[in-house]
């Protein structure tokens, strides 16, 4: 509907609900990851029209139980923030009163009437969400599998952005303020690539008519969805002592195959047979047959070329 702004229709009659996903995608940068994660928190909490968590939730409930959620994700050297709304189709509403327009209006309020004051988020709500995110990250760090995965990525990747988890790190979140996060949000609205996914049953003309009411201007976006790390014939190792009932082994392997390459599907099948599923070689041999690991699996990120193998093992072994 404008340069750098795309609408995707995904028709389906499987569900009683329709889903709208508004995605903002920018370049992956260590300096903005925490800001963007805080933006995702604020989008799901309140806005100027509904300035408290309670009034925000009550409005969603009044829209026949419409659900709103946000998430962040990375793909290659990009970082995305999603705001998702799931609501009942008109056929399942007694009044059949055009719920689509109300839901779209609520989305517009979340995006263009954020809970702000003088070019920054309202401090009271922002401080709560900031603390919630820090607590979430601290709890994750206490999980040995998550902690070892983060440390493995720090050791493997040379790109600073890829070393950082998609929600940031506690120290990065702590450094942000209601002003810096709000300014990042304004930049996202005007500079990020925008993808709007309409999943369900929609009137295409009605959707485009509604979205043209959003002040979405064209933007030039240059994004790198695939990352190919320079090959280095050096094995990096790190051992970190930690109090735990079991030890975690993380292994990272580099593959040059990228999404869409001729070997892409073969590599996906290989990973499934190697370690991703319960019938894979790693699980059936090392865990079930040999008993060398409490748990073991593999995962492959086609957008960075990293094959990760992780296992919970007895520290004596």
Protein language model features and the residues they cover:
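Short, polar/flexible loop-turn hinges at active-site or ligand-entry regions and domain interfaces
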Residues: 46-49, 91-94, 113-122
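Short, amphipathic alpha-helical segments
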Residues: 94-101, 105, 119-127, 131, ...
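His/Glu-rich zincin catalytic helix
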Residues: 1-63, 169-172, 182-285
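Structured segments of extracytoplasmic/periplasmic soluble domains
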Residues: 41-45, 63, 106-114, 132, ...
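M16 family metallopeptidases and their MPP-like homologs
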Residues: 8-10, 16-29, 34-36, 53-109, ...
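Acidic/histidine-enriched alpha-helical segments
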Residues: 57, 113-137, 223-231
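Scaffold signal of the M16-like zinc-metallopeptidase fold and its non-catalytic homologs
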Residues: 134-190
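A common structural junction motif
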Residues: 105-117, 213-221
């Amino acid at each position: 509907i404008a340069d750098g702004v795309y609408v995707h229709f995904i028709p389906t009659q499987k569900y009683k609900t329709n889903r709208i996903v508004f995605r903002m995608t920018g370049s992956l940068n260590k300096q903005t990851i925490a800001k963007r994660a805080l933006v995702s928190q604020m989008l799901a909490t309140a806005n100027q029209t509904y300035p408290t968590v309670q009034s925000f939730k009550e409005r969603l409930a009044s829209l026949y139980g419409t659900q709103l959620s946000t998430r962040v994700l990375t793909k290659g050297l990009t970082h995305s923030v999603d705001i998702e709304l799931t609501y009942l189709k008109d056929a399942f509403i007694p009044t059949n009163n055009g719920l689509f327009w109300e839901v779209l209006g609520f989305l517009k309020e979340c995006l263009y009437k954020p809970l702000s004051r003088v070019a920054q988020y309202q401090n009271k709500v922002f401080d709560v969400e900031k603390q919630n995110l820090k607590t979430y990250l601290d709890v994750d760090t206490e999980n040995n599998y998550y902690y070892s995965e983060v440390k493995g990525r720090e050791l493997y990747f040379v790109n600073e952005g890829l070393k950082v988890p998609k929600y940031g790190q506690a120290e990065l979140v702590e450094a942000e303020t209601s002003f810096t996060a709000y300014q990042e949000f304004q930049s996202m609205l005007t500079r990020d690539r925008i993808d709007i996914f309409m999943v369900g049953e929609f009137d295409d003309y009605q959707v485009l008519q509604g979205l043209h009411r959003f002040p979405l201007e064209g933007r030039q976006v240059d994004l790198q969805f695939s990352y190919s790390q320079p090959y280095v014939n050096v094995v990096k190792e790190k051992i970190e002592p930690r109090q735990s009932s079991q030890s975690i082994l993380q292994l990272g392997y580099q593959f040059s195959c990228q999404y869409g390459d001729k070997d892409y599907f073969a590599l996906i099948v290989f990973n499934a047979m190697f370690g991703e599923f319960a019938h894979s070689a790693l699980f059936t041999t090392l865990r079930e047959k040999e008993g060398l690991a409490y748990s073991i699996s593999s995962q492959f990120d086609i957008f960075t070329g990293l094959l990760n193998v992780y296992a919970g093992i007895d520290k004596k072994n």
